[in-house]
Amino acid sequence: MTSISKRKNQQEHIPAEDLETPKLPKREKIEGTKESNKVRIIILLGYSGYGYHGIQINNPLKTIEGDVVAVLKKLGYLKTNNIDAEHLCIARAARTDKGVHTLRNLISLNLFVDKPLDISLLKTELNEALCSQIRVWSVFPAPKYFNPRISCESRTYEYLIPSFALLPPKPSCPLFKKMQKNLSRKLDNELERNLVYSMNDLISFWNTVKLKQKEIQEMFDTNKDAFTNPFKGMFYEKPIPAGIVIPPQAKLKKALKQAEYYCYMNYRIKEDRLKVLQQLLKKYEGRHNFHNFTVTDDSTSPSNYRFIESVTCGTPFVYENWEWIPVTIKGNSFMLNQIRKMMAHVLMIIRSCAPTGLIDKAFDPNITMNISKSPGHVLLLKDIKFSSYNDSVTDGLEKIQFDCFEEDILSLKIKTIYPDIIKLEQKEKLFFSFLSYIDQHTGHQFDYLFG
């Protein structure tokens, strides 16, 4: 597995899978090839997206399809020098962008060979030649005019929320001061009451942080020259160049900040708080106008409508002492930034005790909300479905299904993707930065939470 320290984090986007693909000009015949030498195939695969600028070829950037095509050329399955994306007719079931991970995706493309193709060997050859971030589950022939984007009926994503992201803001920050209006408002329904009551219980979290920081301060005051950070080695730290001496006050500052991280790390979400999250997420289900959750110039455009089949919270799990909440979102297709904004909107409502009706208001084409994007490194494409295609498969063609690869898929998830996601968060603290920006914001971007 490629070291996490060598992978540059990239923020992902999720373009709409149902947008029309631009029509390509008529392809010229490739020199030195015959139509009989062209074979169209389907590749089922999964991958960790770190270091990649998405799946789609976008030269000169490093992409998943770019690596696959390069390996196919090296293995002799593209017997020409002037092959390009147009002649490959390459397509995918779900277009993932920078940094997005995938357990189950599909690409389809043309091969150009000068001898009979033994497709049974291709999976093994690809896995041996590709980096360990990309794993091929299966390779088999495709119908001549197969379009995976259109044939794919649904896409399922998973978004990992760190439990500490549901904690209230610091009492000293601007967001906490603004949200006092929300805490004192009239509570119109049970969900509103549950939200506020769960918030009141969590205010004590910051007392725990203060006590921990007080212990650190007392240790420092006793003997500042001999002070040692009790959290040293517990959290990622940038290497200190040789010969550099860290002043005592700098050591104290770092220890006080890491005391806060320590409390975050040990926080475990309570059932009532988790229930509020699930009830709010359920409001996304159904067909809605998601104009506030993407980039659009026309809030009334029919293209803003999406059908969300389900949004569910999984059981929180602990990985290397940090607790995470998996949220699964299933829908037909998704627009640019849609899932990240959906998650951010819910987190903002919970953390500020805002009216729960703000989710419904966000669907109103006459209301504009400047919703932030939550971090993208925790987004994972879990599944794609081709039920109608599978029902219509004839002439000995294989169905598109992943059932017999579940063990390998689980291994990719547990051994590569999850560790990459979580270690990156620990190293870059992307959620900490996101929440800190919101908590310290003094402008008017988030005024819709307190109106």
Curated annotation (Swiss-Prot):
It is found in: Nucleus. Binds 1 zinc ion per subunit. Its EC number is 5.4.99.-. One of its GO terms (molecular function) is metal ion binding. Its cofactor is Zn(2+). Substrate binds at Y157. The active site is at D97 (nucleophile). SUPFAM superfamilies: Pseudouridine synthase. Pfam families: PseudoU_synth_1 (PF01416). One of its GO terms (biological process) is mRNA pseudouridine synthesis. Residues 9-30 have a biased composition (Basic and acidic residues). Keywords: Isomerase, Metal-binding, Nucleus, tRNA processing, Zinc. Gene3D superfamilies: Pseudouridine synthase I, catalytic domain, C-terminal subdomain, Pseudouridine synthase I, catalytic domain, N-terminal subdomain. Residues 1-30 are annotated as: Disordered. The keyword Nucleotidyltransferase does not apply. GO terms for cellular component: mitochondrion; nucleus. It catalyses: a uridine in tRNA = a pseudouridine in tRNA. Formation of pseudouridine at positions 27 and 28 in the anticodon stem and loop of transfer RNAs; at positions 34 and 36 of intron-containing precursor tRNA(Ile) and at position 35 in the intron-containing tRNA(Tyr). This is tRNA pseudouridine synthase 2.
